[in-house]
Amino acid sequence: MNIKNYVVCDNILGIRTALKKIDWSFGQPSKTASEEEINQCRIVVRLTIDSLKDEAKKFENSQKYHYWLGDSGRDELFYQRNLFASSKLRLLLRGVKSGQPEIIINKNYLRFVIGRFINLHSIGCQLTDLACAMLLSRELCPLHCSSFSIDGSTVAVIAPGNTGKTLSTMRAVLHLGAFFISEDLAVTDGENIYACPWTSTFRYYDELSMSRLLRMRMKLIKIIPPLELIPMHGGDRKINAYIEDERILSKEKLTHTVILARRPGGVKVLDKEQALSMVLNLNRYEFMYMKSPMLTAYSYFNPEFDIFALEERERSILSKLVDNTTCLLVQSDDPTRFADMIIDGVKK
C-alpha cells in the first residue's frame, strides 16, 4: 500500500493515506509532503482501506450503540452494517485518546456512502468531523472563512454560503494587490490565522477560470445548478495555479473580522456581542462535529472525550478572535464590490 503524506495546514494538520483523492473540507495539496514535514504537524489523521473482516470478529462481543460497537474506555470504535446480500459497510475509528487518530474503512464504505444521510456519513464528512475535534482538543478552532492580508492588516472574511467570501478574497488578491491566506477554510487560535489554502471552491467563478470550456460550464451552472454536482476534469486546480507561491501566506496575526451580507447598507462596525453571535452561527452551519454519529458513539464509551467541552472551547476561541480584532459588517447587493469595500473599511 502506497501511503502518501499531505500537509493541509502548515505545522498544524496533515493526513496520511493511500487514496488519490481526499474528499474532506480541508482540501488536498497539489504535492505530497516529506516525513519531516508531516511530523512537524500537531495533528496527523490517518485514513486506511482494509476489509476489516478480522476486526469484525474482535468486536463480536462488544457493546452495541445502534450500528456502532465499542467497550468502555476502549480507544476503538467499530461500525458494521449490512449492505446487500452478504456484503457489509465497515469502519473502524481508533487512536483518538492516544493522539494518533485513524479511520479505516472497507471498499464498500468508500464506494457507497456519499454525503450525509440520516446517521450514515461519508468518509469525507467523518474525516472532517474528526479533524475538527482534534483541533479543538489542542486549543485550535476551524474557521469557515476566506482570508487575505494587505498593507499590514489581515482579514478573516466570514459569510453565509454563496454570499461572496471566496470571490472577495480572490478579487482582493488578483486585482487589488493582497496576499492570499485562505478562500474557504482556515484554523485560528483566537489571535492568529493559519492557512488551509488547498480548498478550491474558487473554481466556480467565471473570472478565475482558465479555459473556455470551464467558463462555459460556470455559465451553465448558473442556469442549471445541478450541473455543479457533475465532476469535470480540470476543475480541481489548486490555488498555486492562479497565484505565485510567494504570495500565499501560511500564518498571520488577525486584525479584522469581516462579516458579509448580501443587502444594501454599506460598512459598519459591529459590537463584540453581535459579532460573536454571527461568527458562531456561521461556523456551526459549516462544521458538524457536534452532530457526528461517530464522535457521539465514541464519547459514549469514552466520556472523557467530551463533545460539549469541545463546543465550549470553540466558543472561547472565537470569543477571543472577536475581542482581538476590529469587527465589520460589510453589506452590498453586488458581491463584486465586497473586496473594495472591505479594504476601504480596513484602512479607516
Residue ranges and their predicted role:
Residues 1-158, 175-176, 188-348:
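A noncatalytic interaction/capping subdomain that flanks phosphate/NTP-handling catalytic cores
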Residues 163-165:
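Conserved glycine(s) of the Walker
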